[in-house]
Amino acid sequence: MTKEQVLAQQRADFAVAKFIEEILGSGHIKECTFDETRDSAIECAKQNIEASSLTEREKQVAKESVDKTVHEIAKIFKKGMIQSGRLIETK
């Protein structure tokens, strides 16, 4: 793994741990924790793409696809979390 991959993985691991800690502790998740979990997952995926043997164009397309897909999924998930009362809006 590259240094960037390791750092992205550590960031994602910490974000997931915080997400789990909040949901198990209070039954709720702060919006900033939700957003950090999403953003760290995207960064982790992008670092893995960057380290791959794809061409530069393929890497660019893959990163854009990951970004768009994860944001769409997170948007749907976040909406459900807000409707269920599990997400605490912090913005």
Predicted regions mapped to residue ranges:
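Extended non-catalytic scaffold regions that mediate assembly and binding
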Residues: M1-K3, A45, K59, L87-K91
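Intrinsically disordered, low-complexity regions enriched in polar/acidic and amide residues
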Residues: E4, A8-Q9, R57, I82, ...
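Charged low-complexity stretches with an acidic bias
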Residues: A62-K91
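Amphipathic alpha-helical core segments of compact helical bundles
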Residues: A17-E21, G25, K46, E50, ...
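Acidic, low-complexity, intrinsically disordered interaction modules
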Residues: I29-K68
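A compositionally biased, intrinsically disordered/low-complexity signal enriched
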Residues: I23-I29, L54, H71, I82, ...
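N-terminal acidic leader/helix
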Residues: T2-E31
